[in-house]
């Protein structure tokens, strides 16, 4: 079942690259006591994610943070090495936390898994954005089609804060 507005995020683990290598971060580490703008993409470096979704987030990052958001987080079903390379290649190292959900544990726990096996991509995340306050979903914008950025971009979430 897909998570809904008003529900608490389940406990899960992500991997985040640090100078010491991949480190585990829990949902509590990321969301507890914080206001977080979470953006999920089906895959790092994929066309829509890289050319449309990510730019919409970074174009609005300062304005989102100016509205009281503590953290901007980007999650994808990729490993921490890929997410770190993607972060480095965007030159946005300080604007967002890139969360690796390599086994799709978080994605499955919130009912946002997408079977992209037909495209050779395996299980991925649906494309969405959400505003999370202290671990509770306050806003949720789920795309009807994974190749579109119509409601999950940074501009939409900014307008909802």
Model-assigned labels for residue ranges:
Residues 1-161:
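Chalcogenol-based redox active-site neighborhoods
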């Amino acid at each position: 079942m897909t998570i809904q507005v008003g529900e608490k995020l389940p406990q899960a683990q992500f991997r985040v690259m640090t100078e010491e290598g991949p480190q585990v971060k829990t949902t509590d580490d990321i969301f507890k006591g914080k206001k977080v703008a979470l953006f999920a993409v089906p895959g790092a470096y994929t066309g829509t994610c890289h050319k449309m979704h990510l730019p919409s987030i970074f174009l609005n990052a300062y304005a989102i943070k100016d509205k009281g958001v503590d953290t901007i987080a980007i999650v994808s079903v990729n490993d921490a090495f890929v997410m770190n390379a993607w972060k480095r290649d965007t030159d946005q190292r300080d604007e967002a936390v890139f969360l690796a959900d390599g086994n799709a544990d978080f994605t499955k726990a919130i009912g946002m898994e997408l079977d992209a096996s037909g495209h050779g991509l395996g299980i991925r995340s649906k494309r969405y954005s959400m505003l999370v306050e202290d671990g509770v979903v306050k806003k949720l914008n789920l795309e009807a089609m994974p190749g579109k950025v119509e409601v999950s971009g940074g501009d939409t979430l900014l307008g909802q804060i």
